[in-house]
Amino acid sequence: MDFLFYIFSSLTLISGSLVIQARNPVHSVLFLVLVFFNAAGLLVLLGLDFFALIFLVVYVGAIAVLFLFVVMMLNIRITEISEKRLRYLPVGGVLGVLFLFEICILIDNDCIPLLSYDIENTALLANYNQLSFIDWRMYLSTSHTIDALGSLLYTYYFYFFLVASLILLVAMIGAIVLTMQKGIRIKRQQVFLQNTRDFAKTIRKVA
């Protein structure tokens, strides 16, 4: 298990670095697809098989393929990419150093201060004992990821699920309305009039 984790994580880091180092944009998109596959493998190792499947379907099946088609359709010159890369290299280096510094601070310190806070002799202890917790381990041990996700969506977050469905419905109806608008000066074929007219009057023989 640990061996597979090290393989997937190392391949993810290597592929992610090759995304920005590849000179060909098509190769960059292919390395990005490899990053998504390795990340899905990490999710499978964590027991989140449904999220790994969604990750592959959404990112690899839709977004990465869209990137690949856009890159292949556009005529991107490699010289322009190399010039822009050298132009933004100092800014990217500074941001990378700052991000690495923040990660080192988070590793050295406790990420969740309340876990290391002593509440035994404070006024928070009474409020802490009155809180009601849900033991999700009991549900996860007897169900799969899809069951747990469905239970959460349709019990605790069904309002948000309905709102998201309504937003998608409004977006779909709006796209249909925008495409169905009839312009006055747009020339269209009148199929009914063409099929019902008398061909003897419309067709002329040229001697």
UniProtKB/Swiss-Prot annotation:
Q: Which reaction does it catalyse?
A: a ubiquinone + NADH + 5 H(+)(in) = a ubiquinol + NAD(+) + 4 H(+)(out)
Does the keyword Electron transport belong to this entry?
yes
**EC number(s) for this protein?**
7.1.1.2
GO cellular component, alphabetical, reads: mitochondrial membrane
Where is this gene product found?
Answer: Mitochondrion membrane
**Which UniProt keywords are present, listed alphabetically?**
Electron transport, Membrane, Mitochondrion, NAD, Respiratory chain, Translocase, Transmembrane, Transmembrane helix, Transport, Ubiquinone
Protein name in UniProt: NADH-ubiquinone oxidoreductase chain 6
Q: Which GO terms describe its molecular function?
A: NADH dehydrogenase (ubiquinone) activity
Q: What is the first-listed, main subcellular location in coarse terms?
A: mitochondrion
Q: Which cysteines are joined by disulfide bonds?
A: none
Function, as annotated, reads: Core subunit of the mitochondrial membrane respiratory chain NADH dehydrogenase (Complex I) that is believed to belong to the minimal assembly required for catalysis. Complex I functions in the transfer of electrons from NADH to the respiratory chain. The immediate electron acceptor for the enzyme is believed to be ubiquinone.
Species per Swiss-Prot/TrEMBL record: Prototheca wickerhamii
Write down the membrane topology.
Multi-pass membrane protein
Annotated TM spans: 1-21, 28-48, 50-70, 88-108, 158-178
Please report which protein family the annotation says this sequence is part of: Belongs to the complex I subunit 6 family.
Which top class of enzyme applies to this chain? translocase
